[in-house]
Regions:
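Cytosolic C-terminal regulatory domains/tails of membrane transporters and channels
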Residues: 2-6, 371-374
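Helix-loop-helix hairpins and the membrane-proximal interhelical loops
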Residues: 4-63, 67, 188-251
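Alpha-helical transmembrane segments of multi-pass membrane proteins, especially transporters
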Residues: 23, 27, 54-58, 66, ...
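Transmembrane alpha-helical segments of multi-pass membrane transport proteins and ion-pumping complexes
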Residues: 27-39, 43, 62-63, 67-71, ...
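Juxtamembrane and boundary regions of transmembrane helices in multi-pass small-molecule transporters
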Residues: 28-31, 113-182, 214-221, 302-381
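Juxtamembrane helix-loop transition segments at the membrane interface in multi-pass membrane proteins
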Residues: 43-46, 85, 116-128, 224-236, ...
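Membrane-interfacial helix-loop connectors
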Residues: 70-104, 117-119, 153, 165-166, ...
Length: 381
């Protein structure tokens, strides 16, 4: 009896370590898949997306341009870089600010796509979709509050202008050297693009997007099964301590992780399966998501300090606008109990609707990221 128990223990331990190794590989696969989707969008639409910025004739149009461009390119950092270049080329800062706000909303489409990996299980999908869309609702609420204030009083422009002078630096403080994700994903993506280039950039880009989405489904499905068996007892408590210990701790954790991985969409996408499988609750990841919003601004700010010459002040000012906007939005919305609950209620409501009717998901994505901005751009043009 004792011998059998002794033999079983190493087997159980080995199996558990294999599961952890498999989970780590699936995590890498998810990171790779998100990078594939982003790279595919950029490859297929990158140059065309820049044309969108020519339609900036009104702050609302600027907001929609930032939203659509980021949803297409799948990188708020890239869109912010384009905006910096446009400001340096003569675009007024007050016109660029709504674009930065739009970029905040556009970057949230990635985690919504990741949540679809749970679509086969109703309970998991409800939790995952709520976790994904809480980011959307927070950013939409932030824009509803701050865009009118900016149009009337120019508060973000004034604050960023006041802050920009002391932060001018001649040294290179770029964060590019700390990008941990790109080195482990770019070789695979480069190899895939090498194979798909024969179909042309647009078709190849679309194929890379489809392959990325399919990989997300595979990674999420396997991760879900593994996490259900692994995230119990002590492991679950450690994770909750790391993310859900308290609002300030969650915001700080989200900021640090996002600075390290250089992508808020990657950070928030990694939370979706954890909520979907019941390891964490939507309320646990809410502050973490707000931290991700701030973290992506810090990355852009530090990168902007590497810009030298006559346009350095513009790079810093736009980066500071992004940071100031997200910090003020976090303080105001999360600090006021009534406002704090609105993104949660909105996310839970649409998740309930999406669980009952999957067409709601398509309707939501099309409405927020295509129909609404497209219609507004057509009217303002």
């Amino acid at each position: 009896m004792n011998q059998a128990t002794t033999t079983a223990a190493p087997i159980a331990s080995t199996t558990r370590w294999l599961r952890w190794a498999n989970l780590a590989f699936m995590l890498y696969l998810l990171l790779l898949a998100v990078a594939m989707v982003g790279s595919g969008f950029k490859w297929a639409t990158g140059d065309q997306a820049k044309v969108l910025f020519e339609f900036a004739s009104h702050p609302i149009a600027g907001l929609m341009i930032g939203l659509v461009a980021t949803a297409l390119i799948q990188s708020s950092s890239t869109v912010t870089s384009i905006i910096v270049g446009l400001v340096a080329g003569g675009l007024p800062v007050e016109m660029a600010i709504p674009m930065v706000m739009g970029a905040n909303i556009g970057t949230t489409v990635t985690n919504t796509l990741v949540s679809l990996g749970h679509v086969r299980c109703q309970v998991e999908f409800k939790r995952a979709f709520a976790s994904a869309t809480i980011h959307d609702f927070f950013n939409l609420l932030a824009v509803l509050i701050f865009l009118p204030l900016e149009m009337m009083f120019g508060i973000l422009e004034k604050i960023s202008h006041w802050l920009v002078s002391p932060l001018l630096s001649t040294g290179d403080m770029s964060m590019k050297g700390l990008d941990f994700i790109k080195p482990i994903t770019s070789p695979i993506i480069t190899a895939l693009k090498g194979q798909l280039i024969t179909f042309g950039e647009v078709v190849g880009g679309v194929m890379l997007i489809v392959l990325g989405i399919a990989t997300i489904f595979v990674a999420i499905t396997v991760m879900g099964k593994l996490m259900k068996s692994l995230m119990v007892g002590r492991a679950k408590e450690i994770l909750k301590d790391a993310i859900g210990r308290g609002p300030l701790h969650g915001i700080l954790s989200g900021s640090i992780v996002t600075v390290l991985v250089q992508s808020s969409s990657t950070t928030t996408s990694l939370m979706v399966p954890l909520v979907g499988t019941g390891v964490l609750k939507v309320r646990d990841v809410y502050p973490f998501t707000l931290g991700a919003n701030i973290g992506t601004c810090i990355t852009a700010l530090l990168a902007a300090t590497a810009v030298s010459g006559e346009f350095a002040v513009f790079a810093l000012q736009i980066a500071l606008v992004h940071l100031t906007f997200n910090v003020l939005a976090t303080v105001l919305i999360y600090g006021v109990p009534f406002l704090r609950e609105l993104p949660i209620k909105g996310a839970e409501m649409i998740a309930e609707m999406a669980t009952k009717n999957k067409a709601v998901v398509a309707g939501y994505l099309l409405s927020v990221f295509i129909i609404m901005p497209g219609g507004i751009l057509a009217l303002t043009a």
